[in-house]
């Protein structure tokens, strides 16, 4: 009731100048709608049920409209692992043999797979789409939490602007329904922010926000980077510091870590501290640079501008007009970007979890626009529409489209099909998108953990001289796979090998308009004619 009373008082003060008649009319409307929706127990997740259903429905639509691949981890570090956990076959990359990844996140999808198996519905379509739909539902609920956070801190009008900016973000559209640890990190960070004790918050709960932060850390240890300044700020502001540490920080940290260790003990077969291994490899030793390195300013000059896109001017404007109590959020964003900048290996998705925080500042910008507001709305929608649709429906779709050709090999009776993927490692999904134990191989690319200067992985060795590698690898025709998959750019280099061994092109799918390096515009499947 205290929250409702404060809202009533705010509306009264705002409308005193409008006369008694208008005031009585607004008061009546407040008690019939606004007060009921402000109650924590109203509808779903403390919000209007229709809003929650609409938000989830939007993300489900978003999910169905994203039919492209982004990075290998969305399959190889989640669905592929879950498939191995449930069906006892599926490829585990070197990160799993070295204990750098934990089973907590794949366990969610393994549970889905197990239910489908028990129901006799473990068809490949369900195995591909239901995990993504589950992630879409969580992202939709996170959107509602972001809206609710701002509504409780400020007002409904500002909350609508923040939510509008969140829905317009092309990069959120691109990532929010993918089975990436970064996506789950963003979801949990948004939940945590809703319960974080910001000044003026009526939804704060130290226990709930710390649980969300702890879960994010278990799923992706670098999630703690965003929360380091926020945790210190909370500690500095807290009067009962000893109680906060003893009753909140330590119990939650110990329990969640114990749960993670237990899960990993079950699936690794030994005690494995994956969070420490992950941080040691990627942060302390900076060995992620094996997969590429960028200059220190990359996130500032490319990363942030690309993921914010046309939100950037509104974000900058929002930073100038947002009340001072939100400065800690800006500090958290800046700290995250600068910390990731210190690491050699950089990717757009690494800073995706700061995007919902940035939307708060964008919302303040729109709320404070005095002129050109309608033009700004149209500009933001249209400027994000093209990249959202292009990246979601066209760019890099071949990696998924080619899987339909592989799935058909499973349907052939008495199939003795075998497959070799002659592409940069992990370019396409694996057993999680095939769901049958046909023989499949690919060019591997584990990093050198022995620190040898002469080390070269299999994929790089292949691309030094593809034709020579193939002739050496398949020196006996009995070793030849029945099918080969490759990017179009490789075909001219190995055409003689294909011809001499009776390989014929059986499938061609479009992949990208922007081929570069070892990636081609199309993906080909070749089938060997043994007659």
Swiss-Prot record:
One of its GO terms (molecular function) is alpha-1,2-mannosyltransferase activity. One of its GO terms (biological process) is GPI anchor biosynthetic process. Pfam families: Glyco_transf_22. Glycans are attached at residues 84, 204, 414, 476. One of its GO terms (cellular component) is endoplasmic reticulum membrane. It is an enzyme of class 2 (transferase). It comes from the Eukaryota. This is GPI alpha-1,2-mannosyltransferase 3. The lineage of its organism: Eukaryota, Metazoa, Chordata, Craniata, Vertebrata.
